Structure formats: structure tokens, C-alpha cells
């Protein structure tokens, strides 16, 4: 099992090797899972990059299906399309973006790539009144991934990650079975995000309840739990915040300009990526064929990140996971 740390390419390229070597050596990581937001060339540190997280455009579905009028109806202004949808005019922009990402992943010689198999309109993140069903989004994911991979052959695994919005939630085997049966690329598996799974039930009130909930869902996957090759290990318990957001916004006219100014604060309040410190997580890790255990933590400073790494290490080292 690899112990990995998630990192973005926001770091200055002159300092990226120093940054990666610091965390890898000090905390005994085997490497990183990279998510890219800029055009920097990361091949100089590719020996440290085990996985590549494909960019997530949360509202991609209507761009992909050509429902541009629905995007204007919600977002009012085209200036938001690219960051939320992956393009401004047509699905070809989104497909081309992801094709380029696969070429980057190939150049970096990563072992796996991760894709968020879900969609949410930005206002739905406040109200939880979702326009599209899980099945509709999964059908979109299948079509998009088949377009992007386009019968190309790569050496890396494609891991589908669960979220709490419409799409893949990993709550039952039927959704996984359906997804896997339609994807043409066959070197596939699952990336279980523990925080995302907790987020899918905003009635959970404690880490103990969260652990039991994750265990039940894994049991519900049946034989498909054997495809969980990766785990994004983190913890969020934000049900109280979510319930309040739903109550305050479901019957309210939402100002999109105001929402876009605070959307990242809102999402981080739901999915805040703390360490998973309940020792019950250890049995879950041991029950799965995980090869890539990723500390996926969010921090506002290096000091906060190191504190979170230490807190996560404390739990896993106690039970000799590493």
C-alpha cells in the first residue's frame, strides 16, 4: 500500500521539488497524487507522482448535453461557464481538456487517474433540490468517459470517485455494476472518498455513526468492494451546516453573483477535509484491497497541513497501517 499526499501545482515550479521532498522524507510518503490547475510542466518531479486527479468541473453535464440555455438560466453570465463546466460553447471543449489531461498523465507515467463521477448545478449545492437523477448523471459520465478515452490505450488505471451529489455515491452495487458495464476502458476501479461518503448522509451526528455508515455502504457493494483500489482519506461531518443551508435557501431567490463570491467557502464548509481520527477507520482500510491511500487534506497554511498529517499518522501508526 502506498502512502500518498494530495498536492496541487500552485507551488512555484522552482520550489516544487523542495516542497515534495520535504513532505515525502519527513512524513514517509511514497509520493503524491497531483491535481493540475495551470500549464506548468511537472515532468521534472514525475518520480514522485503516483496518481493524477483529473480536474472537476461541477456543472459539466449541461455543457456536455448541449443545454446551454439552462446554463444561462442559472448562471446568467457566460463568465462562469469555463470554471464550472469546462468550456463555454460546446462539449468538444470539455472532451479536449480531458484528453490533454490524459496525455499529461501519460507523460508523468502515473499508475492511476481519478475522475469525479458526478454533477451539481451551483445553486443546487445550497438547496439540494437536484434537477438530474443519479442515473442521468451516470449515463452522462459513461458517454463523456467513452468520448475522452476514445479507445486509446493507457497503462494507468481509471478510478471513479464517489461524491454526495447526483452520480456515483457508492451506496449500492447496482450503480457500480451499471457504470462498469458501459465503460469501454477496462482498466478501471474505484476511489473511495471517506469524507464524501459521510457527506451523502447529512443526518449523521458522530464519527461512530459515520464509521458504521461507511461499513454498511461497503457491504452493500458486494463483490464491487474488491475494486476499491484507492482511498481519499479525510473526514467531514457537516450535516448541521447542510440542513441549515437547505432550510435557508430552498424557498429563496438565489443571487448568482453573491453565491459565486462565497461558493468556495460554502463547499469547504461541507467538505472540509480534516484527518479521520476515529480508530474505526482502521478496520475499513484493512477490509479493502487498497493500493493507494491518499491523505487528502485541506489546510490554509503549511503549519496546519503538517498538524493534520501528524494527527492522521497518529491513528494509522498506532495500528501499524504504515
Regions found by a protein language model. Name each.
Residues 23-27, 32-34, 126-138, 144-145, ...:
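Residues lining hydrophobic/aromatic ligand-binding pockets adjacent to catalytic sites
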Residues 61-72, 131-132, 247-253:
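Aromatic- and acidic-residue-enriched segments that line the glycan-binding/catalytic groove
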Residues 17-24, 40-43, 102, 145-149, ...:
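Short amphipathic alpha-helical segments and helix-helix/interface helices
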Residues 87-189:
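Active-site acidic/histidine proton-transfer and metal-coordination neighborhood
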Residues 1-9, 30-34, 48-54, 113-115, ...:
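Hydrophobic faces of well-ordered beta-strands that scaffold small-molecule active sites
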Residues 1-2, 22, 95, 99-100, ...:
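Histidine-acidic metal/acid-base catalytic patches
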Residues 1-100, 318-322:
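N-terminal pre-domain/capping segments
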Residues 10-16, 29-45, 57-62, 92, ...:
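Acidic-and-aromatic substrate-binding clefts and catalytic sites of carbohydrate-active enzymes
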